[in-house]
């Protein structure tokens, strides 16, 4: 694969990413935070809303970047497997993206990574390789 050049995203890229992500998951809900409003001393007409990414298929916002990356690199990936290193949320996100795009995925994780992350990545079809960080 040729070396990828980086470029500053434009607003059109954001709109395209939103459309890609919407094909694979529902938007995360907004939750009003009364506690933060009170802590900040906000008036009656001022609100604080938090985006709850715990509702995504992997419980993290990282799935969105993984889905968009996979979509934008399908031609470069071709029939080859995708490999990634992560100890948690990105491992799950890229594994989910690979499942959605029917790509083989190999995840390298430290042995000390949370077991729930191993299980979730594997549930999406990831092949896991571990290493000892000591």
Residue ranges, per PLM feature:
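PLP-dependent amino-acid enzyme catalytic core
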Residues: 2-134
